[in-house]
């Protein structure tokens, strides 16, 4: 029985010890364990696999993906980072720039501004095309000139009072429709995601006048096309108390973990510790600094339970980004199967 439990732990748990981590590699492949049928089976996979949405708001999404291998989870994360397309500034035509910011630095800053535009409604620009069209390009104009405020107090030293337009923000970017874009996109839908991103600072007489072309691209080509601010995953924590912890030791145990992980209850007049919500733990391993309590707790992670956190830049809602990443992954699988079929035919 003990041997069976040890094997099951090796197969399903990554165990964190005081001086190292055990069972870090996936070992449940066919033939590795006697008495276990680890051959891949689609029906069994469909039965065990699930996705649970834990939290979603305008720009962030947390969900659990259960029943998959680390390779698939990481492929999904990499697709979110680098292969879901967005629109971003690609070309900057500078007519006049007398600010302290050099042209190339200014163009780089503009490229990193997230653009609120659905990339699914646009095509990739053909390589070598210099002039954009309404199906592959968005055009923005930025024209700001700094002047002195004639109504400012004489003894004022506040730039906000002394100067007009001395800070250039993304709100100064004006969308210029190409072709029939004005009919396709209502006013206000094509814009920078945030209107308060500082681009440059000016002083009286300085001016920025330029034209921007936004095109469709992916983060694999340049980070400015990445649709997510963060896309990460972690394994679900699994915390087990190996023996009862009571009295002051229970309070001490709860302080060794993140708030909400260990709960102290009153049972028959005694304080008793129990694991309330291991999901909240950050695995600081503070428990191993306590000589009395480190032997009564087992810290582990569930090998096939991934907690995904996706934070959108605001270009698209996070649930849309996840669905688009799934489509990209499915497309990769189809191409792989097509390649296999082509090899078999040859």
Curated annotation (Swiss-Prot):
N-acetylalanine: modified positions: 2
Single annotated GO MF: protein dimerization activity
Name of one Pfam family that matches: RNA_pol_A_bac
GO cellular component, one term: cytosol
Modification type Phosphoserine: residues: 4
Subcellular location: Nucleus; Nucleus, Nucleolus; Cytoplasm, Cytosol
InterPro entries named in the record: DNA-dir_RNA_pol_30-40kDasu_CS, DNA-dir_RNA_pol_insert, DNA-dir_RNA_pol_RpoA/D/Rpb3, RBP11-like, RNAP_Rpo3/Rpb3/RPAC1, RNAPI/III_AC40, RNApol_insert_sf, Rpo3/RPB3_RNA_Pol_subunit
Zinc keyword on record: no
GO biological process, one term: transcription by RNA polymerase I
Keywords from the named record: Acetylation, Cytoplasm, Disease variant, DNA-directed RNA polymerase, Leukodystrophy, Nucleus, Phosphoprotein, Transcription
Assembly: Component of the RNA polymerase I and RNA polymerase III complexes consisting of at least 13 and 17 subunits, respectively. Pol I complex consists of a ten-subunit catalytic core composed of POLR1A/RPA1, POLR1B/RPA2, POLR1C/RPAC1, POLR1D/RPAC2, POLR1H/RPA12, POLR2E/RPABC1, POLR2F/RPABC2, POLR2H/RPABC3, POLR2K/RPABC4 and POLR2L/RPABC5; a mobile stalk subunit POLR1F/RPA43 protruding from the core and additional subunits homologous to general transcription factors POLR1E/RPA49 and POLR1G/RPA34.
Disease: Treacher Collins syndrome 3: A form of Treacher Collins syndrome, a disorder of craniofacial development. Treacher Collins syndrome is characterized by a combination of bilateral downward slanting of the palpebral fissures, colobomas of the lower eyelids with a paucity of eyelashes medial to the defect, hypoplasia of the facial bones, cleft palate, malformation of the external ears, atresia of the external auditory canals, and bilateral conductive hearing loss. Leukodystrophy, hypomyelinating, 11: An autosomal recessive neurologic disorder characterized by brain hypomyelination, delayed psychomotor development, intellectual disability, tremor and other neurologic symptoms. Some patients may additionally manifest non-neurologic features, particularly dental abnormalities and hypogonadotropic hypogonadism.
Function: DNA-dependent RNA polymerase catalyzes the transcription of DNA into RNA using the four ribonucleoside triphosphates as substrates. Common component of RNA polymerases I and III which synthesize ribosomal RNA precursors and short non-coding RNAs including 5S rRNA, snRNAs, tRNAs and miRNAs, respectively. POLR1C/RPAC1 is part of the polymerase core and may function as a clamp element that moves to open and close the cleft.
Homology family: Belongs to the archaeal Rpo3/eukaryotic RPB3 RNA polymerase subunit family.
HAMAP family given in the database record: RNApol_arch_Rpo3
Name of the featured protein: DNA-directed RNA polymerases I and III subunit RPAC1
Species whose genome carries this gene: Homo sapiens (Human)
